[in-house]
């Protein structure tokens, strides 16, 4: 099962990705985790990514695309994967499609979690409170101003992916406002 999870920040993509991975025994491919791993291993592409990050610039699409392509080649992805946080743009989606075709693979589904933006802000605030209570580190972008910027960026860059995947008959919409377990059940239903 090869799945892409879409949805705005705070929609629960990471939570649902973990549940799908447990159910289907496939890895979660998070761009953040993959970037950290290639940097930690000091691979050639990891060195390039680290240089961009150290220079204060976004890691280029070409590097992110290569990291994802290389990760899909690893043996634990043979039976599938859940992509979380990638693709973020139609350009990345087009590259992903080409990469998968070159490997004789294709996506099985693209799940978009539909969530009310006001509710997302409340979720973010709750996550901050829970993290503080647990003595954890609060993400630097977990504040209302940064969160609003992330939502704008999502609407401008990532939301157009819905139409891209709808045209390819891969898009499945799931209400992300219901409970975590119920969202998971709905996802399993649309994957059948």
Curated annotation (Swiss-Prot):
**Superkingdom to which the source organism belongs:** Bacteria
Q: Which reaction does it catalyse?
A: AMP + ATP = 2 ADP
Q: Which UniProt keywords apply?
A: ATP-binding, Cytoplasm, Kinase, Nucleotide biosynthesis, Nucleotide-binding, Transferase
Annotated Gene Ontology cellular components are: cytoplasm
Which NCBIfam families does the annotation name? adk, PRK00279.1-3, PRK14527.1, PRK14532.1
Task: Tell me the domain comment.
Answer: Consists of three domains, a large central CORE domain and two small peripheral domains, NMPbind and LID, which undergo movements during catalysis. The LID domain closes over the site of phosphoryl transfer upon ATP binding. Assembling and dissambling the active center during each catalytic cycle provides an effective means to prevent ATP hydrolysis.
Q: What is this protein called?
A: Adenylate kinase
Which species is this UniProt entry from? Bartonella henselae (strain ATCC 49882 / DSM 28221 / CCUG 30454 / Houston 1)
The gene it comes from is: adk
